[in-house]
Amino acid sequence: MEENGMKSKILIFGGTGYIGNHMVKGSLKLGHPTYVFTRPNSSKTTLLDEFQSLGAIIVKGELDEHEKLVELMKKVDVVISALAFPQILDQFKILEAIKVAGNIKRFLPSDFGVEEDRINALPPFEALIERKRMIRRAIEEANIPYTYVSANCFASYFINYLLRPYDPKDEITVYGTGEAKFAMNYEQDIGLYTIKVATDPRALNRVVIYRPSTNIITQLELISRWEKKIGKKFKKIHVPEEEIVALTKELPEPENIPIAILHCLFIDGATMSYDFKENDVEASTLYPELKFTTIDELLDIFVHDPPPPASAAF
């Protein structure tokens, strides 16, 4: 999508968030003029200063400032939204600005997790997925060029969640039988690959799925590999599916949402529950010169310099 050797200009919403910051860094690493839209009162000043030192252009504003968004769109080629779950429907404001500007060559909505058009989840998570589907249908109805990215599980986040490397206990919780397969990828890789596909003509109006064969595993296999890495055996405490389903009904919103996500990923195995369609593409096949960090390599990182645990907003 680069013309005359010029790199595409990329605008990122949610660039200071958990996955968005990796997209900003990936965009800068690949040499793209990179704009980061942020609230005027953002608390992420240190991160924004880092982005600026790396060459990012920081634009402060609110999503309600329609005219400002339109003018900003006219300066860029590609728009990526990495807004968190509570802001999913705010993407309609981004879409309105894209439609008025009329020049955007590619829009990537805030997907990046499960492939929402292929799965069904328990009600608390299904309601969030449905909001993402609404954004997709609006993109298609407006004939906005798009790429939908299904990056599956964020590896650092879920290794921290499942294995609890910061917790010295001798027990590990297993959700369901622990035998459902799932795909997970290192957040830094997700950021870099997403920038690659955002400017790749082969990904235009397609679903790109991050499912390299080296990064498919079960909970039990993950625990076994971790035990070998650190030379320690854990007692596995299984939480049965019925108990998890019951919790999604008993807990208030939004506390029931993470439980429903655990069910979707690690009991239903949603990231591996569907076959590829003709218009899908698996990310690792596009770029033989790149390599996803394998789960084994990521566990080595956790042994020597574990990434800090993170929390998600719902």
Curated annotation (Swiss-Prot):
Positions of the record's site feature: Confers substrate specificity: 85, 88
Pfam families according to UniProt: NmrA
First-level EC class: oxidoreductase
Record note on pH: Optimum pH is 6.5.
Keywords, sorted A to Z: NADP, Nucleotide-binding, Oxidoreductase, Phenylpropanoid metabolism
GO molecular function: nucleotide binding; oxidoreductase activity; protein homodimerization activity
Control of this protein's activity: Inhibited by zinc and copper ions. Repressed by 4-bromo-cinnamyl acetate. Desactivated by the competitive inhibitor EMDF ((7S,8S)-ethyl(7,8-methylene)-dihydroferulate).
Outcome of swapping residue 261 to H: Loss of activity
Transcription regulation in keyword set: no
InterPro entries noted in UniProt: NAD(P)-bd_dom_sf (IPR036291), NmrA-like (IPR008030), NmrA-type/Isoflavone_red_sf (IPR050608), PCBER-like (IPR045312)
Reactions catalysed according to its record: eugenol + acetate + NADP(+) = (E)-coniferyl acetate + NADPH; eugenol + a carboxylate + NADP(+) = a coniferyl ester + NADPH
Tissue expression per record: Trichome glands.
EC number assigned by the record: 1.1.1.318
Site (Required for activity): 261
Effect of residue 85 to V: Confers some isoeugenol synthase activity
GO BP: eugenol biosynthetic process
Active site residues per record: 132 (proton donor/acceptor)
Pathway it works in: Aromatic compound metabolism; phenylpropanoid biosynthesis
Residue sites binding substrate per the record: 114, 258
Binding-site positions, NADP(+): 16-19, 38-44, 85-87, 110-112, 132, 152-154
Self-association state and partner proteins as the record states: Homodimer.
Record family assignment: Belongs to the NmrA-type oxidoreductase family.
Purpose of the protein: Catalyzes the synthesis of the phenylpropene eugenol from coniferyl acetate. Phenylpropenes are produced by plants as defense compounds with antimicrobial and antianimal properties, or as floral attractants of pollinators. Eugenol is a characteristic aromatic constituent of spices.
Protein name from the UniProt record: Eugenol synthase 1
UniProt source species: Ocimum basilicum
